[in-house]
């Protein structure tokens, strides 16, 4: 621990605003990504490179969600960290690693769609699932190398009434952490915007009556990727850039401090919104979700014999039996139907 001049702003509203935001992000993000992971693990028989990228995006988002209860507890205690030095380092590292991983794989998904739409005959489109898995492992290694410094530094700051655990220093620039924070936004932003523009432009040039529906689906998908990315990451990057531009006059400024904390919560909401990417990635994903919803809404009435004939069974039992048959039919069709590509390019 160190006793540096950490910012401690009394009477601020951060501790009141952050817990509800993080709780909402945790509940919706864990639910959405949990359902997505179940779909990948139990209803996906044929894996393709794009499937591998989307699966790792869901893994990064789900792991980030696991960290949010600890940050919620931190804010509920008025920014007092009660778990010690090592858990603080591990928590901040896990948050940064999975946030960066989510950005990387969201960018890879956009780039993968770019090659399939704009350059359908490029060699990138013929790589095997094993090669895609190797690419994923390399990307995870780079992400870990870029964030491992958070494990090597002490982030606790002891004050009179609390012990803070923050990855950002609000008194001055933060060196490598600020560099990584900016790079992991602006580089992917350039790639995603480029891919979005080229996909939309290419599809509009090739627009034909028979392809209009596919064009709309592909355009909608890439626009969802771009909107989710910009909405979740631009506010926090802008807040940090404003601080760096105005420091030292903005050091420990309550409004600047509060803006950074609140906009950082938007980056966690990226993991809550990424299920929209899965939803628009394939027509089979909405079908999977709807079938789960239908089966969960069917009432259960125990106590009926298993040997009942269909004409003697209550409607609710017939509904349950139909749900089981629907689920089995979905699983048997998943080989060919749950393709994570929106469009089939010939």
From Swiss-Prot:
This is Hydroxycarboxylic acid receptor 1. The keyword Kinase does not apply. Coiled coil: none annotated. GO terms for molecular function: G protein-coupled receptor activity. Belongs to the G-protein coupled receptor 1 family. Disulfide bonds join 88-165. It comes from the Eukaryota. It is found in: Cell membrane. It comes from Homo sapiens.
């Amino acid at each position: 621990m160190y006793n540096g001049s950490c910012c401690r702003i009394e009477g601020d509203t951060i501790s009141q605003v952050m817990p509800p935001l993080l709780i909402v992000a945790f509940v919706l993000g864990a639910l959405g990504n949990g359902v997505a992971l179940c779909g990948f693990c139990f209803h996906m028989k044929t894996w393709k490179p794009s499937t591998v990228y989307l699966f790792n995006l869901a893994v990064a988002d789900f792991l980030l969600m696991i960290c949010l209860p600890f940050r919620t507890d931190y804010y509920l205690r008025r920014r007092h960290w009660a778990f010690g030095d090592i858990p603080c380092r591990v928590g901040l590292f896990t948050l940064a690693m999975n946030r960066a991983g989510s950005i990387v794989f969201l960018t890879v998904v956009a780039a993968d769609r770019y090659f399939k739409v704009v350059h359908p005959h490029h060699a990138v489109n013929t790589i095997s699932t094993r090669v895609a898995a190797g690419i994923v492992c390399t990307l995870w290694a780079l992400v870990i190398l870029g964030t491992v410094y958070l494990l090597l530094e002490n982030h606790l700051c002891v004050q009179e009434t609390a012990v803070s655990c923050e990855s950002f220093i609000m008194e001055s620039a933060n060196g490598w952490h600020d560099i990584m924070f900016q790079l992991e936004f602006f580089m992917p932003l350039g790639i995603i915007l480029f891919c979005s523009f080229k996909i939309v432009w290419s599809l509009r040039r090739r627009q034909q009556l028979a392809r209009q529906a596919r064009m709309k689906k592909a355009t909608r998908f890439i626009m969802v990727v771009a909107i989710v990315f910009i909405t979740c990451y631009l506010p926090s990057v802008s807040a940090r850039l404003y601080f760096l531009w105005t420091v030292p006059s903005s050091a420990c400024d309550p409004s600047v401090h509060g803006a950074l904390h609140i906009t950082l919560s938007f980056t966690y909401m990226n993991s809550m919104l990424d299920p929209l990417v899965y939803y628009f990635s394939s027509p089979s994903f909405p079908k999977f979700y709807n079938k789960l919803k239908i089966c969960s809404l069917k009432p259960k009435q125990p106590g009926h014999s298993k040997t009942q004939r269909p004409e003697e069974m209550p409607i609710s039992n017939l509904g349950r039996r139909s749900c089981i048959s629907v689920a089995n039919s979905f699983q048997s069709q998943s080989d060919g139907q749950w393709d994570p590509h929106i469009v089939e390019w010939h």
